[in-house]
Amino acid sequence: MSSFAPPDASVLALADLIDRALPQTQCTRCGFPDCRAYATAIAEGRAGINQCPPGGQAGIETLARLTGSDVVALDPAHGVEGPRQLAVIDEAWCIGCTLCIKACPVDCIVGGPKLMHTVVDAQCTGCELCIPVCPVDCISLVNVTQDRTGWDAWSADLAQQSRQRYDFHRFRTEREQREQDERLARKAVATLAHLAEESKVTDPVELEHKRNLIEAALARSRLQRAV
């Protein structure tokens, strides 16, 4: 019998409340892959309420009220509270590698392979995830809220917009991965059907080994799609 037990409804409800109270920058500085994962970890008692630099001290106070916890200082291991920043691409140095586009959790960078990229300011969360992936170091951050920091530099409307954009980003990337997997699976099936005719390998033992490898890859692909 499976030992899996669904999450407690009260934990899920608390995670929902916490998630709505987070700024939704999806910056991962909390140590989790996204804001929802951090919210779930707090609700389950696996993370502290002081690991979100974008939310700052005001965010910690809100999370303390929601969880019944004591107000504590921001954990410096996760960063410091600061103003809202926007990513800016130096278009003269951009080589169009698309790595920043792939790294952006809210799809606010537009451009194409070997074409100039640019950031849509109104959609940028200042997550900084585009900075380390740029091979030519042509992305910088600009302070757009001066001395205002944390939630004083952010808003519930911006958080909601960012959550919606992140949800669509996840939907898009998962759909594209499925489509890519399906294309590869169709190609593998076609290769398998005409293996002897199209392969440069003529030795029967090597052909059978190649056939087994393709069949194993197809089996793994089917298993992944079924999960």
Identify what each model region corresponds to.
Residues 25-28, 62, 67, 98, ...:
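Residue-identity detector for threonine
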Residues 2-29, 36-77:
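Signature of N-terminal electron-transfer/Fe-S-associated modules in redox systems
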